[in-house]
Structure formats: C-alpha cells, structure tokens
Amino acid sequence: MQFSRIILFIFFLQIPEIYPDKYLDYKSPFHPTISDTGMVVSQNLESSKIGSQILQAGGNAVDAAVAVGFSLATTLPRAGNVGGGGFMLIYIKENQELFSIDYRGTSSLNSNLKDLFGSKSPAQILEDDYDLTKYSYSASTVPGTVYGLLEAHEKFGELSLKEVLEPVISQAKNGIIVT
C-alpha cells in the first residue's frame, strides 16, 4: 500500500510538467495574438505585409484579403493559387449581415454526369470509381479563385482595384526572396 502511495505521489508531481498551469506558453512562437486595431495573417510574411499596407492606405478587410490572396499566388502558390477555388465569408458589422461567396471550380454548362462518368449513379461512381472523381479529366473544373477575389472586391471593397493590386503586381515584377 505504501509503495502505491509513493508511485501515485510521484505521478502527481509530474502533472505540472505535463499540463502547465498557464494556457499560453509565451516563450513559444505558437500562441494567440490579440489586437484592437486589426491584423493581417497569412502563411507568408511578405503577403501579410501587403495586406497591412492596404489597411494602412484606408482599405477594408476585404481589400486586404483580396491583395493577400493574389500575393500568395506569387509568394506561396500552394496557399494562394489562381488555379483553384474556395469560399469567402464576409461579415458586415454595421448591418449585422453575413455574405458568402462560393468560388469553387465549375464544370462547363454542357457537361453532365452521364457524359463524364457514364450511366452510373453518383453513389455508384463514388463506390466503384472514386479515383475518377479526383484523378481524371472528368474531375477537371474551371478555376474560380480569380473570379471569387474580384467578386468580393467589387461587392465589398473600398479601394479601387488598381490600388489593391498595385503592391501585388510590384511584388510579382520585382520578385521575392526564396529560402
């Protein structure tokens, strides 16, 4: 019994090491950053800097997001490629309205499941020929990223498109540091 208590005591001594008493480890680079004035965050510092410049020039969050989206096509294509698609949610605080833009890739108007996958039902296609839906010409779509970013800017941006894209174009022309 005494031995069990010693083992249990040693275990409980280790708990602070396993579960620190603070939620945030300020020595770690991975912790929340909080701001009252706004911030721009992306997977690339140079793209984020462009977004910050847009905000400082009087642009809104959508202007900054559009600039960062196009910039990432140059700085980090896997994160911001113009050959893909996506979704964007935009919240307008003044009206408490939420808007969504769906700019996933689309198939041509004349395409249909029968032409693409034969007479199988969608369930059969997913069960029998799942790879066809991902790795064949039938899976190809027209990219929607450019449309989506431009649509967001047109509907919700405050700066001109020229003002939003100037730093992005400059970045693409002048090149980036590759590490």
Model-inferred region functions:
Residues S52-Q53:
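Surface-exposed charged/polar residues within alpha-helices that form helix-capping/stabilizing sites
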Residues M1-L8:
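Classical eukaryotic N-terminal signal peptides for Sec-dependent ER targeting/secretion
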Residues Y19-K49, A61-T179:
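Noncatalytic scaffold domains of N-terminal-nucleophile
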